[in-house]
């Protein structure tokens, strides 16, 4: 068992991973678009199959898990992160932008991440 889980851009996941992450009480979803599409993995054949999501198998299906906290839109395409914020959801925190560039430029972001996952407000 882990005290905290930090999700990166884990867009394609199995139902097992989705359930494990969303059932954990302290998750930091660092990138929008995490947990977006349900896949099935066949380790014997070394294949990954899209089960649901990305408008499949029906055009109206976006998030493959119908996840109430999907924050893909509008945040996935904000790569500048000029006003990056963390906001709380039922089992953790999410961000309001795609922080790839900001992580390379901001030393304070790592401190913010540490404070969120450890519950330290300072």
Model-predicted segments: where are they?
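Short, well-ordered secondary-structure micro-motifs within conserved domains or adaptor modules
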Residues: 2-10
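Histidine-centered active-site loop/cap adjacent to the catalytic His
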Residues: 97-122
């Amino acid at each position: 068992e882990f005290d905290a889980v930090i999700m990166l851009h884990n867009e394609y996941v199995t139902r097992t991973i989705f359930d494990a992450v969303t059932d954990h009480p302290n998750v930091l979803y660092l990138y929008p678009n995490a947990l977006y599409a349900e896949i099935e993995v066949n380790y014997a054949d070394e294949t990954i199959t899209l089960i649901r999501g990305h408008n499949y198998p029906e055009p109206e299906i976006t998030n493959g898990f119908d996840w109430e906290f999907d924050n893909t839109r509008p945040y996935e395409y904000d790569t500048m992160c000029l006003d990056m914020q963390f906001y709380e959801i039922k089992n953790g925190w999410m961000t309001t932008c795609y922080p790839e560039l900001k992580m390379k430029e901001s030393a304070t972001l790592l401190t913010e991440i540490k404070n969120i996952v450890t519950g330290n407000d300072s």
